[in-house]
């Protein structure tokens, strides 16, 4: 029985106490070297020098209606590519290459000999290259062949290439195993926490070895046979522990030393966080003794304008965007994320459902994971769990999403197999899966749901009451929901402890699943993204609470208020609904919400009615137009915490007041200039850091001009280099790596990458308006 579960056949009580670690593979570890720089990329007979992370698809741009990845992949091409790099043989008895992610079907060759391969594009893998290295003065060559030509193989934008980091690991034959430190806390109170540390020692030599593992004051003796491993464990206590939580993400660290004959042969320092949590149908989700409602978002792996290229700075920014939007939970849909993303969740304070797969044995696309599942699923689950099990942010493992074969009894066997594979490496977290029904036959899932510790509901939470009556011990969370149902989903979780939370689809706009979330106008083509032929003019999904430039949509502010505000201390936000007929008669798709904007600029609509929405939990809202009272509205749960005013539009100033706060929207004048702002004025001169620069079209008073669509030309000089540019218009087919971008709704974004030298980077943007510039320091 897993150590976090006390259960009978029909009951569930999860009591989970764990502490976890940020992986010891931090930059600067003496046993590793970043291998991201100076690769030769070969494709279609052409060779260029590239630095990793690298995604060749994003450099070409969408080929609307024609790209091999289809509407699901955003009309990009996929294909094949080859990466080459030379290097000197490093010191060390054993040398390995760690690939954090290659999409997909990677083959690794060292000096012409095949050293390893890996099929799945989202899990890390390590290749021992020791037997293939030169041991004289000759340079070695690594070749990585990537095959993403079998299309379509993914329901969203995957990217193509070595899109995550590569590391060279050097070690003695006797060493702490990769991901070989595991930290848990079986007992946590406010006064004291019990911390258990397991250390796995690997002996890759031809003789038995006697070793000592030191963790704090503990000295653990062990004998490790040749070509074998041995795990030792110790326990210590932390008095008055500072508990990890989203509000207070406290981290500790401990060091494990491996010694032989008194000499230290390996050392690993691990950051960890202490906290306890439980899931229960009567109490809900309890973290450190307090009930917490889970306000979650599903997030894909792409980084928008960067495609799949997983820079640490972009991953951190993504987590921070979700934190700033009021979320406390992310579901990594539908694949393992990056180490940097999870490190950010640990340090910023964000709970995580770590998801392994989209589908299983029945294909969703002709060349998806179903083609390799039987030979790969245990390896891939182990890779995910071993790498991630020390992260305090992770509260659940997810084994799948909307599997097609749900009516086949064998699906229960598959779920059990996957759960067992996870438990081989970690029993401290519940296993979940996102279930969905495309017909009325929902109850057929009951035997499948029995396998799961927490049951994921995709768009099916309206079944919660009848399911609870049928199975009162079942713990549920809605693993996907429609953005438009924000209030109802909050209410269900707020009122029913057995429903522990909700995850909207999605937190961020993303590439692929082209046109999901769109609104359109009468006379335009109807249908959803999967309509035959797709919507070739689209290459991304606009269902996110935050758009691809990082701007929070009004639905984001509304959701944040629902989950995080109360009457005594409520946020206040005002937005304006696009009038029906302003452009055309508005039509919505399933994931769409009414086009609503932070704008009081509606030229040509003077004297006509327009709806103004104010979001707050304060009991009363007053609205003023040009300092004249328009009206007063009462706000309560009955009004879904919205005050809606119907106002005849006049240019000027619109002001809402509630709870001692006020918010103002002003009519914008003609575009006067470009305003550039950056998320950071100083970035690291390590060749890996990024600055995200927002471009806004403003009038002479600094108001954003929401209808401005102005072509801009970008130049970057100095220490850094241009990476990409983007607007939130997911119908714009300009390649993201082009130095030309057109603002949409008055906004665009530029991404600059650092070099490995100190200095200043100047970013200039030319347009029909005066040229705007901004400088960023590299240190």
Predicted ranges, named:
Residues 27-68, 86, 143-145, 515, ...:
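Accessory carbohydrate-binding/adhesion or oligomerization-edge regions at the termini
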Residues 27-98, 150, 154-162, 174, ...:
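Extended carbohydrate-recognition surfaces in non-catalytic/accessory domains of CAZymes
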Residues 134-137, 198-280, 648-651, 665-669:
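Extended acidic/polar, glycine-enriched regions
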Residues 197-201, 254-257, 592-598, 612-615, ...:
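Beta-strand-rich structural segments
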Residues 313-566, 571-575, 586-590, 596-601:
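Substrate-binding/catalytic cleft of secreted carbohydrate-active enzymes
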């Amino acid at each position: 029985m897993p150590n976090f579960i006390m259960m009978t056949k029909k009951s569930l009580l999860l009591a989970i106490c764990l502490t976890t670690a940020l992986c010891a593979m931090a930059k600067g570890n003496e046993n590793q070297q970043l291998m991201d720089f100076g690769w030769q990329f070969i494709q279609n007979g052409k060779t260029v020098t590239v630095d990793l992370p690298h995604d060749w698809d994003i450099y070409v741009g969408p080929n609307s209606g024609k790209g091999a990845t289809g509407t699901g992949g955003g009309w990009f091409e996929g294909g094949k590519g080859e990466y080459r790099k030379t290097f000197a043989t490093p010191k060390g008895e054993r040398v390995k290459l760690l690939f954090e992610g290659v999409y997909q079907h990677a083959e690794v060759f060292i000096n012409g000999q095949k050293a390893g391969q890996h099929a799945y594009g989202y899990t890390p893998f390590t290749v021992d290259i020791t037997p293939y290295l030169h041991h004289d003065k000759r340079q070695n060559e690594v070749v990585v062949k990537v095959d993403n030509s079998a299309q379509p193989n993914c329901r969203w934008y995957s990217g193509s290439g070595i899109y995550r980091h590569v590391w060279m690991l050097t070690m003695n034959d006797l060493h702490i195993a990769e991901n070989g430190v595991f930290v848990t806390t079986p007992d946590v109170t406010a006064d004291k926490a019990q911390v258990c540390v397991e250390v796995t020692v690997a002996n890759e030599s031809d003789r038995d070895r006697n070793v000592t593992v030191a963790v704090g004051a503990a000295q653990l003796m062990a004998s490790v046979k040749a070509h074998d491993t041995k795990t030792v464990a110790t326990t210590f206590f932390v008095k008055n522990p500072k508990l990890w939580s989203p509000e207070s993400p406290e981290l500790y660290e401990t060091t494990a030393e491996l010694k032989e004959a008194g000499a230290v042969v390996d050392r690993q320092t691990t950051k960890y966080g202490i906290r306890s949590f439980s899931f229960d149908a009567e109490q809900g989700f309890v973290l450190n003794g307090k009930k917490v409602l889970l306000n979650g978002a599903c997030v894909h792996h792409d980084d928008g304008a960067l495609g799949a290229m997983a820079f640490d700075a972009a991953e951190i920014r993504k987590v921070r965007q979700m934190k700033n939007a009021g979320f406390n939970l992310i579901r990594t849909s539908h694949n393992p994320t990056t180490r940097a993303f999870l490190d950010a969740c640990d340090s910023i304070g964000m709970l995580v459902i770590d998801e392994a797969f989209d589908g299983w044995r029945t294909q969703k696309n002709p060349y998806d994971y179903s083609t390799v599942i039987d030979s790969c699923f245990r390896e891939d689950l182990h890779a995910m769990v071993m790498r991630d099990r020390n992260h305090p942010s992770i509260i659940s493992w997810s084994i799948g999403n909307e599997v097609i074969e749900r009516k086949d009894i064998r699906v229960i066997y598959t779920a059990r197999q996957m759960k067992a594979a996870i438990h081989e490496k970690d029993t401290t977290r519940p296993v979940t899966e996102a279930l969905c029904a495309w017909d009325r036959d929902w109850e057929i899932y009951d035997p499948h749901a029995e396998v799961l510790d927490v049951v994921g509901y995709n768009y099916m939470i309206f079944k919660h009451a009848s399911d609870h009556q049928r199975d009162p011990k079942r713990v549920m969370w809605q693993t996907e929901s429609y953005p438009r149902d924000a209030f109802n989903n909050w209410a269900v979780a707020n009122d029913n402890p057995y429903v522990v939370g909700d995850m909207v689809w999605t937190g961020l706009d993303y590439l692929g699943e082209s046109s999901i979330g769109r609104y359109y106008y009468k006379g335009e083509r109807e249908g959803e993204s999967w309509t035959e032929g797709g919507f070739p003019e689209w290459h991304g999904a606009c269902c996110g609470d935050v758009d691809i430039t990082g701007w929070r949509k009004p639905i984001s502010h509304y959701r944040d208020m629902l989950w995080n505000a109360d009457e005594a201390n409520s946020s206040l936000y005002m937005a304006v609904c696009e009038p029906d007929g302003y452009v055309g008669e508005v039509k919505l798709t399933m994931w769409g919400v009414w086009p609503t904007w932070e704008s009081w600029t509606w030229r040509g609509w003077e004297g006509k009615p327009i709806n103004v929405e104010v979001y707050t939990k304060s009991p009363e809202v007053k609205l003023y137009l040009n300092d004249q009272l328009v009206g007063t509205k009462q706000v309560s749960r009955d009004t879904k915490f919205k005050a809606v005013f119907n106002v005849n539009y006049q240019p000027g100033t619109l002001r809402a007041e509630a709870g001692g706060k006020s918010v103002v929207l002003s009519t914008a004048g003609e575009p006067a200039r470009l305003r550039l702002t950056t998320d950071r004025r100083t970035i690291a001169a390590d060749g890996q850091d990024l600055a995200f620069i927002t471009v806004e079209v403003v009038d002479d008073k600094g108001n954003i001009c929401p209808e401005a669509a102005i072509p801009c030309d970008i130049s970057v000089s100095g220490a850094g280099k241009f990476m990409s540019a983007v607007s939130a218009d997911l119908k714009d087919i300009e390649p993201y790596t082009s130095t030309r971008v057109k603002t949409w709704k008055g906004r665009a974004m530029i991404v600059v990458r650092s070099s490995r030298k100190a200095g200043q980077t100047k970013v200039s943007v030319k347009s029909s308006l005066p040229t705007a510039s901004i400088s960023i320091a590299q240190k």
